[in-house]
Amino acid sequence: RARQEGKLHRAAGSDYFIFPRSCFTDMPAFAIGRAGWDNWMIYSGRKNGWPVIDGTPSIQIIHQNHDYSHLPGGQPHYKLPETFENVRLAGGKRTIFELLDVNCRLENERLQPVPFSWKKFWREVEIFPLVRLHSYFLGQVFYSVFHPVKAYREFRQSIKRKN
């Protein structure tokens, strides 16, 4: 039934992680099940120089479809305080990584480098200050160069919040 009715989850969300216990001893106190914590796991792995592996091609994982009736107003959690707090704990919006940001894939029972694509190349350039130089400021600058309209909108929103 999963093969017939199921659909692949979008790359922004990751639900399963396998890692040595010693890797994430400094994990912030995230609200698990809300946005941000899974993205931080990918970011943290890349920042620490660890292999971050996408197992999607080799591992079939079933994620149950559900609604959000258990949340206030039955709305998705993306605009709820717990999600905003998760993003803050993660270090801000630039640390929200997704499957595009992994550096290996588990495919045909072998670890392989992520195949080359221009999208991946430019994303690696964009995140270079975050994962190699460990500079959030330069990460923000690079984000602004690659996404000027989004960066401008974020800037305008931050000014509105201050007023």
Language-model features and meaning:
Residues 1-43:
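Conserved catalytic core of nucleotide-sugar-dependent glycosyltransferases
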